[in-house]
Curated annotation (Swiss-Prot):
Disulfide bonds, paired cysteine numbers: 66-126, 187-240
Pfam families, per database record: I-set, Ig_3
Keyword line: Disulfide bond, Immunoglobulin domain, Repeat, Secreted, Signal
A GO biological process held by the record: pattern specification process
Domain (Ig-like C2-type): residue spans on this chain: 42-143, 166-256
Name the UniProt record assigns to this protein: Zwei Ig domain protein zig-5
Superkingdom of origin: Eukaryota
Outcome of gene disruption: No visible phenotype. In a zig-8 mutant background, 74 percent of animals have cell bodies of ASI and ASH head neurons displaced either on the top of or anterior to the nerve ring. In addition, double mutants show defects in the positioning of the ventral nerve cord (VNC) axons characterized by axons of embryonically generated PVQ, PVP and HSN neurons from the left and right VNC drifting into the opposite cord (axon flip-over). Both defects begin at the L3 larval stage and become more pronounced at the L4 larval and adult stages.
Gene: zig-5
Signal peptide: 1-25
Record PROSITE patterns: IG_LIKE
Tissue specificity comment: Expressed in PVT, VD1-13, RID, AFD, ASK, RIV, RIB, PVQ, DVA and RIS neurons.
Length: 260
């Protein structure tokens, strides 16, 4: 039987969804400073997986990946030669609850370079920001191997691709949460046509069961998964699948419930 706290959180979450289910979560306000000051444990934001310098052939498709250890979850912005090229708003439900303890997460972001040439080569930055800490940045220099264009290919034919396969571009890989707490797992995707996302729970025998219709899980309109803990579960794992006509990809996430 759910505890009164769990019931309260469930009602709060449900009211937010009903009132704003068709509103982008990018419009959810950043946590006020009072939330940061009220935390029992200080918030954290550090690089978990830095970007690496890459050399590749002209015409290659590349994926850059960075990851951050954070509490609360960060907003992640990508830059190429100083110009913003992609961004992912933070998962903000945890700060809306005004909790004194926030879960700790590892969040990974990916940026796809569809075709490498002089226009897409250069320096890339992956920046994470949080309302409670200073920003952190990791960078990568992407260079082209010296070889004749006739050998390595050209990007002219795919400069503006009409279609592209799905990629999970922002994802909560792991989460440490208090028993009975509310956790938001990010699953943001890119691709043309826009990929559809679907969440599954990974059972102990590694089979997949849909979260649809289960009271403690809610698939948000931006692709994220909202979880209301039941105070009895020790850990659980989930899979986000992103699909469009060009294919499908998936990422797995784990949540561990621990007392502070």
């Amino acid at each position: 039987m759910p505890s009164p706290l769990n019931h309260h959180l469930s009602c709060f979450v449900l009211s937010v969804i009903l009132l704003g289910s068709h509103v982008s979560t990018s419009k959810i306000p950043i946590a006020p400073q009072s939330v940061c000051e009220g935390l029992i444990e200080p918030s954290v934001l550090s690089i978990d997986k830095p970007l690496e310098n890459i050399k590749a052939n002209r015409g290659d498709s590349l994926v850059l990946r960075c990851a951050f250890y954070a509490s609360p979850q960060p907003t992640i912005v990508w830059y190429h030669r100083g110009k913003r090229v992609d961004s992912h708003p933070a998962a903000h439900f945890e700060t809306l609850l005004s909790a004194t303890n926030l879960g700790q997460s590892v969040v990974e972001s990916a940026l796809r370079i569809d075709c490498l040439d002089e226009r897409t080569a250069g320096e890339y930055f992956c920046e994470a920001t949080s309302p409670c800490t200073q920003p952190v940045v990791t960078s990568s220099t992407v260079t082209i191997n010296k070889a004749p264009k006739s050998i390595t290919g050209t990007c002219k034919s795919i400069r503006q691709p009409l279609e592209s396969p799905p990629i999970v571009s922002d994802f909560t890989l792991s989460r440490i949460e208090l028993p009975g707490g509310v956790a938001q797992l990010a699953c943001r995707v890119r691709g043309v046509p826009t990929p559809k996302t679907k969440w599954f729970k990974i059972e102990e025998d590694e089979s997949l069961s849909t979260i649809d219709g289960q009271p403690n899980y809610m698939h948000l309109s931006n692709g994220d998964l909202l979880i209301v803990g039941d105070e009895e579960t020790i850990s659980e794992s989930f899979r986000c699948v992103a699909s469009n006509p060009l294919g499908s990809v998936h990422q797995d996430a784990s949540v561990i419930y621990m007392m502070a």
